[in-house]
């Protein structure tokens, strides 16, 4: 059975950058964001239930889910948010477990932004946190997504704190520096962790 390394970090931490460095080494990924999009794909049963609940205004002209419109709709409405989470989380969790079970590589990177918040840590053998300061989160996210600071702050407030996330970490990659300056260091750190995880996987399956 594949050894599972959970990769997590707050908004703007650079999880995708780190995940890509692992894939460059041939490590397979199971990405929660990809799974979350798959379960509400166009014409899917779950998307039909969401439209039934919220109305067709949460769809794009192509009939796909408008994630920004849905996010805005539920963010300040706790009942709607609870309804949506109760619908989606079990389906996403089952799909992720299925994908993890299908992996045959020595270890798999399980990329989940809300790994701790959604209580998915039990699916992991080890947890890797990409750590940045709250100031870096705000600066990066506002540049990347053209979100205003208030929206980003709301998202950050809905996630666990930096301190809480670090309590769960078995391994930490600090990603505060600019990528252009920091890339060689990140590549070296990922290579070291890759070799360590291969050894851990071998020990688990011995």
Swiss-Prot record:
EC number(s) given by UniProt: 2.7.1.24
Residue ranges the record marks as coiled coil: none
Enzyme class, first EC level, given as a word: transferase
Domain of life, per lineage: Bacteria
Residue ranges occupied by any DPCK domain in the UniProt entry: 4-204
GO biological process, one term: coenzyme A biosynthetic process
Catalysed reactions listed for this entry: 3'-dephospho-CoA + ATP = ADP + CoA + H(+)
Biological pathway: Cofactor biosynthesis; coenzyme A biosynthesis; CoA from (R)-pantothenate: step 5/5
Subcellular location field: Cytoplasm
Any one cellular-component term (Gene Ontology): cytoplasm
Entries under InterPro entries matching the protein: Depp_CoAkinase (IPR001977), P-loop_NTPase (IPR027417)
Keywords: ATP-binding, Coenzyme A biosynthesis, Cytoplasm, Kinase, Nucleotide-binding, Transferase
Binding positions (ATP): 12-17
Major place of residence: cytoplasm
Role according to the record: Catalyzes the phosphorylation of the 3'-hydroxyl group of dephosphocoenzyme A to form coenzyme A.
Family: Belongs to the CoaE family.
HAMAP family: Dephospho_CoA_kinase
Protein name as it appears in the record: Dephospho-CoA kinase
């Amino acid at each position: 059975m594949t050894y599972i390394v959970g990769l997590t970090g707050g908004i703007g931490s650079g999880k995708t950058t780190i995940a890509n460095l692992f894939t460059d080494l041939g490590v397979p990924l199971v990405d929660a964001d990809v799974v979350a999009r798959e379960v509400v794909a166009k014409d899917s049963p779950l998307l039909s239930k969401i439209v039934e609940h919220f109305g067709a205004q949460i769809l794009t002209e192509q009939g796909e889910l408008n994630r920004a419109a849905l996010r805005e709709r539920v963010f300040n409405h706790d009942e709607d948010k609870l309804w949506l989470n109760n619908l989606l989380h079990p389906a996403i969790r089952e799909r992720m477990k299925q994908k993890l079970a299908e992996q045959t590589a020595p270890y798999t990177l399980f990329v989940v932004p809300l790994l701790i918040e959604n209580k998915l840590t039990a699916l992991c053998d080890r947890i890797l946190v990409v750590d940045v300061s709250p100031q870096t989160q705000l600066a990066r996210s506002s540049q990347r997504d053209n979100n205003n600071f208030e929206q980003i702050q709301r998202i950050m407030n809905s996630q666990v704190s930096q301190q809480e996330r670090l309590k769960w970490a078995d391994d930490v990659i600090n990603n505060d520096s600019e990528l252009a300056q920091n890339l060689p260091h990140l590549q070296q750190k990922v290579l070291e962790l890759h070799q360590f995880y291969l050894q851990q996987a071998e020990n688990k399956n011995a």
